[in-house]
Amino acid sequence: MIIKICGVRARDHALTAVDAGADMLGLVFAPSRRQITVEDAASIAEAARFAARGRGRAITLIGVFVNETVERIRDIASSCGLDGVQLSGDEPVIYADALAPLLVIKAVRFDDSAQERAWLIHDQAHVQLLVDARVPGNYGGAGVVADWERAAELARRRSLMLAGGLTPENVADAITRVRPWGVDVSSGVESNGVKDHGKIRAFIAAARAAAR
């Protein structure tokens, strides 16, 4: 089970996630209240990698983008040493080839658009799907639960990450019902809009226990 803590903006929250056993950290470069500068992201990435190495493992750093150009995504990925990118907007499937060999995580929301259908049938080793909730005018981090029934149906055909309204309290049920490759959380480990150390630890522990 891959566990991704998304929307990390502070070094101490990143280190808590690493210490608790997170596999991925998401750094948001798209305009939002969780947006981070390239400089801060590079600093957090360096600290997280150092902490992970001290525990004999690795941490995967993912940059989150919304409708950004391929050139800008590549520039930021290079500057921060990102391992992969998450495309949370309306990016066309040609981005998959353009961003290789970076890991590409594409958010899908079952909006039944032609563009999303192209991603759903796209099959490349470096591309992973992330199922999120469909919220009009919102590109993620809204705390709304995704369609677990449709996610479970998709998970039977290909591996996926599950996002959308996950919390320490419901992640075990989500894993049992959907059987995803990974889970992604942002607002579910926050208190008053700020990452909460206790909730980060509780979420990771609950996800690990459910995946055993």
Curated annotation (Swiss-Prot):
GO terms for molecular function: phosphoribosylanthranilate isomerase activity. One of its GO terms (biological process) is L-tryptophan biosynthetic process. Pathway: Amino-acid biosynthesis; L-tryptophan biosynthesis; L-tryptophan from chorismate: step 3/5. It holds the Pfam family PRAI. Keywords: Amino-acid biosynthesis, Aromatic amino acid biosynthesis, Isomerase, Tryptophan biosynthesis. The keyword NAD does not apply. Belongs to the TrpF family. PANTHER family: N-(5'-PHOSPHORIBOSYL)ANTHRANILATE ISOMERASE (PTHR42894:SF1). This is N-(5'-phosphoribosyl)anthranilate isomerase. It comes from Roseiflexus castenholzii (strain DSM 13941 / HLO8). The gene is trpF.
